[in-house]
A protein has these predicted regions:
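Histidine-anchored nucleotide/phosphate-binding helix
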Residues: 56-72
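Structural motif
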Residues: 46-48, 190
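Single conserved hydrophobic/aromatic residue that forms the stacking wall/gate
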Residues: 1-10
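Loop/turn positions that initiate beta-strands
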Residues: 21-25
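Short alpha-helix capping/helix-loop boundary micro-motifs
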Residues: 11-18
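Reductase modules of NAD(P)H-dependent flavoproteins
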Residues: 81-234
Length: 234
C-alpha cells in the first residue's frame, strides 16, 4: 500500500474504534508475514535493516525473532539503521539498546536524525510498550569545524542505559552506504528496507505498481552495487 492508502486505513480504524462502546469486542487479523528467509536460502553473514519513521517496529521484531529464538553464535550479525525526523520521533530505541547491550558482538545500531539540536540535551524516549526512558544526547569533541565537515564519524551520541549509540545529522546518504556497507563477494549481506514510500524509493527504488511485488532495484543500494537478490523492500 502507498503511504496515503495506509493513512486512510489508519484514519478509518481510528473512527471505528472511537465509536465503539466500552467492553465491545475487537477482532484483530494477523500477523501478516511481509518477509521470511526462504528455507532453501543460505543464511547470510549479516542482515541489515534500514528503517524510517514508525516502521522501526519491524526492526524490533527482527531482533527479537532472531536473538530470542536462535543461538546468537549461529545467527547472522544484525545491523539496524534507523532514520527519524527529530529526536522526539525516535521510538523503541531503548528496546534495541537492550539487545545491543546483551549481544554487543552481534548487534549494531546507528541513528540518523534530520533536525539535531545544537547543544547536548535530554531526550524523552519510550520502549515498545510505552514505558518512558530518559536518554542523554552529547556532542562529541572535534578539533575544528573543517574536521567536522570532512569527518565520516558522527558528531553526536545518544546515551541510553549507559550505552552510547552514534547519531548522524541528516539523512542516510550514498556515501554512508558505500563507506559503511560496502558490498563484498566474501561477506553475504541481506538488506531489508522498511519505511515511508519516499524513504524506500531513495534507498532501493519504488515497489511495483501492484504494491505487492518488489519491482526493479534502484536508488542508493543499486548505485552501491547491490543486486535484487540482496535487497528486500518491505
Amino acid at each position: 500500500r502507498s503511504r496515503r492508502q495506509r493513512q486512510m486505513c489508519i484514519r478509518d480504524r481510528s473512527r471505528y474504534l472511537h465509536r465503539l462502546r466500552p467492553s465491545a469486542p475487537v477482532y484483530v487479523r494477523g500477523p501478516e508475514v511481509t518477509w521470511q528467509l526462504p528455507s532453501h536460502a543460505k543464511m547470510p553473514d549479516e542482515i541489515v535493516m534500514m528503517v524510517g519513521g514508525t516502521c522501526v517496529a519491524a526492526s524490533h521484531q527482527l531482533l527479537s525473532n532472531v536473538l530470542d529464538t536462535r543461538d546468537p553464535a549461529t545467527s547472522p550479525k544484525l545491523t539496524v539503521w534507523y532514520a527519524a525526523s527529530s529526536l522526539d520521533a525516535l521510538q523503541a530505541v531503548p528496546d534495541m539498546v537492550r539487545y545491543l547491550k546483551q549481544y554487543p558482538e552481534h548487534v549494531q545500531l546507528r541513528l540518523w536524525v534530520e533536525r539535531m539540536p545544537r547543544h547536548s540535551q535530554q531526550a524523552d524516549l519510550c520502549t515498545a510498550t510505552g514505558i518512558p526512558v530518559g536518554a542523554r544526547v552529547r556532542r562529541l569533541d572535534t578539533a575544528t569545524w573543517l574536521g567536522r565537515l570532512w569527518s565520516r564519524r558522527p558528531v553526536h551520541e545518544l546515551v541510553v542505559d549507559g550505552v552510547a549509540v552514534p547519531v548522524h545529522s541528516g539523512r542516510i546518504s550514498l556515501e554512508d552506504i558505500q563507506t559503511r556497507l560496502a558490498r563484498s563477494e566474501l561477506w553475504r549481506r541481506l538488506v531489508l528496507v522498511c519505511g515511508p514510500d519516499g524513504f524506500v524509493h531513495a534507498l532501493a527504488g519504488p515497489k511495483a505498481r501492484d504494491l505487492l511485488s518488489q519491482g526493479p532495484l534502484g536508488g542508493m543500494l543499486r548505485a552501491s552495487g547491490y543486486t535484487e537478490a540482496e535487497v528486500f523492500k518491505m
